[in-house]
Amino acid sequence: MINSGKIKGVEFIAVNTDMQALINSNADIKLQIGEKGTKGLGSGSNPEIGQQAAEESREKIKEVLMGADMVFITAGEGGGTGTGAAPVIAEIAKKDVGALTVAVVTKPFLFEGARRRVQAEEGIEKLKENVDTLIVIPNQRLMDVAKKEQTLLDAFKMADSVLGQGVQSISDLITIPGLVNVDFADVKAVMTNAGSALMGVGKSSGEKRAIIAANAAVSSPLLEISIEGARGILFNIAGSKNLTLTEINEASSIITQSADPDANIIFGTTIREDLGDEIQISVIAAGFDENRRHFSGVSAANPYLKPQSIPLPEPSQVIETPEDPQPSAQVKLAGKYKVHHNEVDIEDDLDIPAFLRNKY
């Protein structure tokens, strides 16, 4: 995400216990946590060590976050630092700094074992208590929806595309003037204390591109349930100068028809000439009934039940995976509003969110 260069006007800050991982990061600022407890090493896939490291470095974390209006925390759940430190960072961001705090995390693959899955679920529950909005993406869906001939790298790029577009859609809404402008207050209205949320992205070009992209966004195979009944929806329609009012209306109608009748719907459009004939649509839906927060679209007996197959973007269309490992980041948006994005990285590959892995 750091090397892609697609998120403009931001400052990335890497956070980790592992000094070696920080050295390999291309982030503008690198923050080592838990020096006394970990001696510059990783957390050994132990969430307690990750939590202790963050607690030890509370003041340092608070210092780098101070002044931010919005904080994104991204982590791979199930390991040590990501699972243990993320809730502490979230608590600091929301309660001490007063920032709108959004977490985007991944759940481990089945092959990573029961222990990591249990640790992931426990970490997610703790994280949920300290954020305004929590978006969970199950890595297992990558295996379920990928075509047989697609490589592992292509699958990771698809997930990277989802995460990258999700973060970019929010930052673009705030920082890039569009046909329909949205500011930070609009984003905050949808995402403050929203609880569990869903994120979907879609893209298309050619005839009926708006309809196809909108349908893809609201039925993304990486989503565990539909956006039906959401009481808060934030979506961004991005395209070049040939984006028409009719296309905006078509896409908006598809997205909003599934929402709660009284939903707070915030949308904006951004002009990006680099898209050419392509339209990209990102949707974040929140404010579901409590009984839907435990994803009803997945069997309780099999939390990774294979969803209906839906075409994913071709590898050439997704955001490039950075060449170098990116342990973590914090994003500060330039201009009137400052937005921090923290991605907590850990010491081994399986701890790194699938969308951030670069070596397999």
Regions found by a protein language model. Give the residues of each.
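Tubulin/FtsZ superfamily GTPase core signature
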Residues: 1-360
